[in-house]
Design a protein with these regions (language model features):
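A short glycine-rich, Lys/Arg-flanked "PGG" loop and its adjoining helix->strand segment in the class I
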Residues: 112-127
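Class I SAM-dependent methyltransferase Rossmann-like catalytic core
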Residues: 1-34
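Eukaryotic N-terminal low-complexity, Ser/Thr- and Lys/Arg-rich leader segments
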Residues: 1-11, 71, 75-76, 250-253
């Protein structure tokens, strides 16, 4: 029997920080002044604070929110804090200058809904920047029948580009890279695979029993993307029907 008690997907801290640094390198070539930043997924306040020292930070995970006393103390220390912000579609949105999503999309069974929530958060002419794990992640584990499966929301990057356009984003740019992790022991590989949500129920026992079938390495397909919200949200397509927001209708002069 496996001694692992849960197979809940998460992201190892070392991986989220590594990908955040790679995203930040891509952000350096983009001209952006951000006062309000929403974190979707892993939160790296220190890293973002270096680029946007005056920005306020928000996230949808209430567990990560700093209390009012903590925020006051951090303000006195000139360090960033994070506040909770709902992504509820019924609440007023379009408040953010930047949505930063580090390794979140692949955790969603319906990733298109997450893309739509990002669009609701952003002001006109604001930036979405994200990274997620693509469908080739953990492909080495699939040689062991019944032990692993692709991550639920590991979309092909072209499908994500289409979802961005359908949700009202403009100028989407997508690229990807492969990162190969090598391990000295099967247990170390298994630990990371479980954290990433690659191992199905009872899969850990199968991998341990048949580890000689799979190499001691794991591929991460990391997909990066960014897109802008247009100056005016003129229309959106839903089920083949274009809708025009009332506040976007211009009177002819």
């Amino acid at each position: 029997m496996s001694t692992l008690l849960k197979l809940t997907p998460s992201i190892p801290d070392w991986l989220s920080l590594e990908i955040a640094n790679r995203m930040m390198e891509k952000l350096t070539i983009i001209k952006l002044q951000a006062e309000h930043i929403f974190h979707s997924g892993s939160v790296q306040l220190g890293l973002m604070h270096k680029r946007f020292p005056k920005a306020r930070h928000y996230c949808s995970n209430a567990k990560l929110e700093h209390s009012s006393i903590q925020r006051l103390l951090l303000q006195l220390l000139r360090r960033p804090s994070v506040q909770f912000h709902s992504t509820d579609a019924l609440r007023p949105q379009h408040l953010m200058d930047l949505v930063w999503s580090n390794l979140e999309l692949q955790h969603h069974d319906q990733p298109e809904l997450l893309v739509q929530s990002w669009e609701r958060l952003l002001k006109p002419e604001s930036l979405l920047m994200f990274a997620y794990l693509g469908p080739d992640t953990g492909k080495e584990l699939r040689v062991i029948d019944g032990a692993s499966e692709p991550i639920a929301g590991a979309w092909d990057m072209h499908d994500v580009g289409d979802a961005l356009l359908k949700s009202g984003f403009a100028e989407p740019v997508m690229d990807m890279e492969y990162i190969t992790l090598e391990y000295e022991h099967p247990d170390l590989l298994l630990k990371d695979a479980i954290e990433l949500g690659l191992v199905v129920e009872k899969g850990s026992d199968l991998i341990k029993a048949n580890h000689e079938l799979a190499p001691l390495k794991m591929t991460l397909e990391v997909v990066y993307g960014h897109a802008w919200t247009p100056e005016r949200r003129l229309s959106k397509s839903h089920d083949g029907v274009a809708k025009i927001a009332v506040d976007q209708i211009l009177r002819s002069k």
